[in-house]
Amino acid sequence: MVDPRTPVVVGAAQVLQRTDDLAEARGPIALMARAVTGAVADAGATIATADELTVVRSLSTRDRNPAQAVARRAGIAAVRHGLTPHGGNSPQWLVNDAAARIAAGQLDCAVLTGGEAARSRRRAKAAGADLPWMTADESSAAPTAVGEALDLSHPAEVAARIVLPIEIYPMFDVALRAGAGLGVAAHRAQIAELWSRFSRVAARNPSAWSRTAMTPEQIAEPGPDNRMVGFPYTKSMNANNDVDMAAALVLCSAERAEALGIPRDRWVFPVSGADCREHQYVSHRWSFTRLPAVELGARLALDLAGLSAADVGLVDLYSCFPSVVQLGTAAIGIDPSREPTVTGGLSFAGGPFNNYSMHAIATMVGLIREGRSPHGFVWANGGYATKHSFGVYSASPAPWRHASPQAEIDAMPSRALVTGSDAAGAASVEAYTVVHGRDGAPARSIAAVRTPAGARAWATNEDPALGAAMAADEWVGRTVRVTEDVGLLA
């Protein structure tokens, strides 16, 4: 007998739009509505009403209340229309939040969705076309804001123009490379092999955007179609946001699922979750080679489910760049030889901005139903490896459990940041990247450095020759000079 308040995922669907005809291209609202309709059909029941329909914030629509627009198109009468802030952790956070409220008797049916039409929007802008869905609908009532909106960039990072993911995530990988004692070429071969494994999973995934497996050499070698973006990453190692994709999930209480007549073979149980964040700003993180919040949050989610990482047969680690997979594998204690994705990751399965992990969860639900494993684990990440949400899914029911290790994380050491005259002088390179232009040439070097007192400072340089030198050899540990205006002098 399943406890009537047990949360259960009863429906999941994914939508891809590949049309090259802009007249046929549908916007994110239409794609999300198709995903919702598909998730309801996947449940094998008629679901015309829900307590809430919540949308993961999309970068492809400026509609005031996208959830209300999706509900109207999908024919779902929802009591509440929700909208998350930005953050790739949002899909798993939404599942954790809905599961907790279902278990507490506050909710019986939640529809979650997210989607992007970034590819069609980009192509329309390039063609000078103004598609109907590109005009924002401001007529709806304001949505209900859900989740934590977090400022991700320290003012000093903004002032130094260090704000893009491709300017920050590569620095984690450079620090990992130095810590492992690998040369530049050996390290690039290593991460290219990791990404080749992701591409092979995507090639088997019918819902992946790119289903072409790539060799490590194809991924590692810069070229006209695979330029260097942010050293050490070629284009193939970056999340692919140039996609039109949507996904949706339907969660119910067990008693609502029974009342709706949803077959038991559709049920997959979210059994535990955890949500937390690192120190808010990268400037204050103690190290570029560890994610303490992932160490604590993942272990907590697994402990609450009574499982270890080795017990979970299906895993999807967030994968916007190779660094985050390596950091996550080490933090969670996953055997590096294991498959760390069920989709193929953001570079190959597709990176629809904040909503990637909803595709991972939808894929996980399908694989658990098929009997591939009785348990699955999802880690969703937002910001610069900042916000984390973890979920454990099971073929068998269990009481929902959730907790957060945030108090313990907040008590951990943070690194002081110095700027201006306090940063000027000799310093040791801690991590760095070289941002390349569209022509593939070095354009801007960015370094996190440590002062003799152990504080962190930022330094940049736009000399192409210095950028080429930093991309050719190991600079972590070298002594450089920093100027008051954030200049980096070799």
Question: Which residues make up each language-model segment?
Answer:
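Conserved "HGTGT" condensation-loop signature of ketosynthase/thiolase-family condensing enzymes
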Residues: 1-83, 99-107, 111-243, 247-249, ...
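General structural concept
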Residues: 82-90
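A glycine-rich, Thr/Ser-enriched phosphate-binding loop motif common to dinucleotide/cofactor-binding enzymes
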Residues: 89-92, 293, 355-359
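Conserved phosphate-binding catalytic cores of ATP/NTP-utilizing and phosphoryl-transfer enzymes
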Residues: 91-100
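A conserved active-site cap/scaffold subdomain adjacent to cofactor or substrate pockets
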Residues: 350-357, 368, 373, 377
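Active-site-proximal alpha-helical segments within enzyme catalytic domains
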Residues: 361-364
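Gly/Pro-rich active-site capping loops and adjacent beta-alpha segments
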Residues: 386
